[in-house]
Swiss-Prot record:
<dbReference type="Pfam" id="PF02449">
    <property type="entry name" value="Glyco_hydro_42"/>
</dbReference>
<comment type="function">
    <text>Hydrolyzes chromogen 5-bromo-4-chloro-3-indolyl-beta-D-galactopyranoside (X-Gal) and p-nitrophenyl-beta-D-galactoside (pNPGal).</text>
</comment>
<feature type="active site" description="Proton donor">
    <location>
        <position position="141"/>
    </location>
</feature>
<dbReference type="InterPro" id="IPR013529">
    <property type="entry name" value="Glyco_hydro_42_N"/>
</dbReference>
<dbReference type="GO" id="GO:0009341">
    <property type="term" value="C:beta-galactosidase complex"/>
</dbReference>
<feature type="binding site">
    <location>
        <position position="155"/>
    </location>
    <ligand>
        <name>Zn(2+)</name>
    </ligand>
</feature>
<keyword id="KW-0479">Metal-binding</keyword>
<comment type="similarity">
    <text>Belongs to the glycosyl hydrolase 42 family.</text>
</comment>
<feature type="active site" description="Nucleophile">
    <location>
        <position position="312"/>
    </location>
</feature>
<keyword id="KW-0378">Hydrolase</keyword>
<dbReference type="InterPro" id="IPR017853">
    <property type="entry name" value="Glycoside_hydrolase_SF"/>
</dbReference>
<feature type="binding site">
    <location>
        <position position="320"/>
    </location>
    <ligand>
        <name>substrate</name>
    </ligand>
</feature>
<dbReference type="InterPro" id="IPR013780">
    <property type="entry name" value="Glyco_hydro_b"/>
</dbReference>
<feature type="binding site">
    <location>
        <position position="140"/>
    </location>
    <ligand>
        <name>substrate</name>
    </ligand>
</feature>
<dbReference type="InterPro" id="IPR029062">
    <property type="entry name" value="Class_I_gatase-like"/>
</dbReference>
<feature type="binding site">
    <location>
        <position position="152"/>
    </location>
    <ligand>
        <name>Zn(2+)</name>
    </ligand>
</feature>
<protein>
    <recommendedName>
        <fullName>Beta-galactosidase BgaA</fullName>
        <ecNumber>3.2.1.23</ecNumber>
    </recommendedName>
</protein>
Length: 645
């Protein structure tokens, strides 16, 4: 199903009825409203003006449209900030942020939590039983603009309480953090400050705990809203719209309190921000990289325990990236179908009409500011017509699992040990290699069951807890670990037994030394799979195992024990392609090296082929396949769907 984000408060009431009618005629089913409307709902403290929202919801309902109602806590009004100036967050440099943008609040602020509780309760009491309201979105894009981590006095106080609950005694904290180093011992929890503005780098254990705390504070704030909505809006779904390439917040943890996950898909903006080779960035500037949206669909399907929406789908040029090209004609349709192929229940476009004013006036919508339909509108309407003729089959478990860990991203942010080391970069390298082989992927958190997966890839998991080790031991397929896995304890120390720590229960090896290398400094590793030039990261390993790949000095780059493999270097795309293809074949899968720009995704017995390239390509469909959309020759920026026997 399809939807759209709509802001009735931005437009004269005389337009609302016509807008709703055109939404229905375009084949849209859901409309998100209200997530930035607090100042219009409550223009002065205690003076509520519900009338305009009542009328807007009634207008949408009259056309049979279902509403996703956003709680308005992402934008506290000016009067609230003036009354409680302490709700404003403090940045890493110790500066109090100001009113005038959005997300201008601290998650730890008692005053703001109380105000949020009040407005969400009023909203839920008024609309929780309304038939037109299908569900709620909590807040909007938690953490956007660098707002997960605040450094205000309230956060410092809350952090001390969090530490006391975690460690119990200050002696335990000192031991866990290794505060004997640099004379950093603490006598009590009130001496512990937030880890910023230090002369040299702060203690990494301290910093990691602060990142954990900050993520927990967001979850607590979200749970406060969820509990209110559950009480006053029984039977209505609750979701939140997460962001792309964002790791400050543990979405797996927060989503435990939601019915499903949502995310905001902007393929062109993300591609422009990605550290891709220049030629690749130019090639996909108007289409988005072929794996950027797909990765997040698979991630948030995992976050949502099998269920997700795209709450905001890019319909045209955006306004927030360094460069904001217009999508190639056909791409809005392709992105929409791709989301559906990966299991999205709803794809909702942002926004119905481009705003002619304020910060996002250069962000395209389905309509231009003069209300004329724009390119994205016609493509969305085409998808709606195509969807009406098809009944999508359910999504099955993929044959490949990729283990993704937000805590791993924090570990490497705290201590990258190399300027180019990027957790997301490594994750994307593995994911893209799998996709280039035509393989479907489930993205799962550490500790999730790996039963039923023919192949599991763990690009890097520095902290291996007991539940994760148990899942690896019980995995039914091949498991590939990437560099730095098992390299830290839960308290951010090197394991006594050396890395890969607990994974030594699976692989008899020890990492005794590591190095990070500047770009261009490469070493050749070779073995039965071929010769590969590797750089950026290398580990020296002691092991009775004979390496599958070895460097010229005899050091190993890849080791195997039974169905477990350990990669002791940053892999090149060439190495990953050969290695993963071989492992997939061994696991009984059928990898296929796809043409550049072509990607596949299966949904039940249906196979989707998406062509991100400027030239037509042949879909790897068997002879006599029944095509539901398109044909065996997939045109530029087009797709095809066929049914497997």
């Amino acid at each position: 199903m399809l939807g759209v984000c709509y802001y009735p408060e931005h437009w004269p009431k005389a337009r609302w009825k016509e807008d709703a009618r055109r939404m229905r005629e375009a084949g849209l089913s859901y409309v998100r409203v209200g997530e930035f409307a607090w100042a219009l709902l409550e223009p002065e403290p205690g003076r509520l003006e519900w009338g305009w929202l009542d009328e807007a919801l009634a207008t949408l309902a009259a056309e049979g449209l279902k509403v996703v109602l956003g709680t308005p806590t992402a934008t506290p009004p000016k009067w609230l900030v003036d009354r409680y100036p302490e709700v404003l967050p403090v940045d890493r440099e110790g500066r109090r942020r100001r009113f005038g943008g959005r997300r201008h609040y601290c998650f730890s602020s008692p005053a703001y939590r109380e105000e949020a509780r009040r407005i969400v309760t009023l909203l839920a009491e008024r609309y929780g039983g309304l038939e037109a309201v299908a569900g709620f979105q909590t807040d909007n894009e938690y953490g956007c603009h660098g707002t997960v981590r605040c450094y205000c006095p309230r956060c410092q106080e809350a952090f001390r309480g969090w530490l006391k609950a975690r460690y119990g005694t200050i002696e335990a904290l000192n031991e866990a953090w290794g505060t004997a180093f640099w004379s950093q011992r603490y006598r009590n929890f009130t001496e512990v400050e937030l880890p910023h503005l230090t002369v040299a780098e702060p203690n990494p254990s301290h910093l990691l705990d602060y990142y954990r705390f900050a993520s927990d504070q967001v979850r607590a704030f979200n749970r406060l809203q969820v509990e209110i909505l559950r009480a006053h809006a029984p039977g209505k779904f609750i979701t939140h719209n997460f962001m792309g390439f964002f790791t400050d917040l543990d979405a797996f943890a927060l989503a435990q309190d939601l019915d499903f996950a949502s995310w905001d898909s902007y393929p062109l903006g993300f591609t422009d921000l990605m550290p891709l080779p220049p030629e690749e960035k130019l090639r996909y500037a108007r289409t988005g990289h072929p794996d950027v949206a797909a990765f997040h669909h698979d991630l948030y399907r995992g976050v949502g325990r099998g269920r997700f929406w795209v709450m905001e789908q890019q319909p045209g040029p955006v306004n927030w990236a360094p460069h904001n090209p217009s999508p190639t004609p056909g791409m809005v349709r392709l992105w929409t179908w791709e989301a559906l192929a990966h299991g999205a229940e709803v794809v909702s476009y942002f926004r119905w009409r481009q705003a002619p004013f304020a910060q996002e006036q250069m962000h395209a919508g389905l309509h231009r500011p003069d209300s004329a339909p724009d390119q994205g509108f016609f493509e969305a309407k085409q998808v709606a017509e195509e969807l009406a003729a098809l009944a999508l089959p359910p999504v099955a478990q993929a044959p490949v699992a990729l283990v993704f860990d937000y805590e791993a991203a924090w570990v490497y942010e705290v201590q990258p040990q190399g300027a180019e080391w990027s957790y997301l970069g490594l994750i994307y390298l593995f994911y893209s290699a799998l996709r280039r082989l035509g393989l479907d992927v489930d993205v799962v958190p550490p500790g999730a069951s790996l039963r039923g997966y023919a192949l599991t890839v763990v690009p890097s998991l520095p902290i291996v807890r007991g539940e994760a080790l148990k899942a690896f031991q019980e995995a039914e397929g091949i498991v590939l670990f990437g560099p730095r896995s098992g390299s830290k304890t839960e308290t951010f120390q090197i394991p006594r037994e050396l890395p890969p720590g607990p994974l030594q229960a699976l692989l008899p090896l020890k990492v005794v030394r590591v190095e990070s290398l500047p770009p261009g400094l490469l070493e050749v590793a070779e073995g039965p799979m071929g010769r590969f030039s590797l750089g950026l990261w290398r580990e020296w390993v002691e092991s009775p195992l004979r390496p599958w790949l070895a460097f010229a000095d005899g050091g190993g780059a890849l080791y195997r024990e039974g169905r477990y493999l350990y990669l002791a270097a940053w892999p090149s795309p060439e190495l990953l392609g050969v290695l993963l293809a071989g492992l997939a074949q061994e696991a009984g899968l059928r990898p296929v090296f796809l043409p550049e720009g072509l990607r596949l995704r299966r949904r039940g017995p249906w196979v989707f082929a998406f062509n991100y390239g400027p030239e037509a390509v042949e879909a790897p469909a068997p002879e006599g396949a029944r095509f539901l959309l398109g044909g065996k020759r997939v045109g530029p920026y087009d797709l095809a769907v066929w049914e497997e026997a």
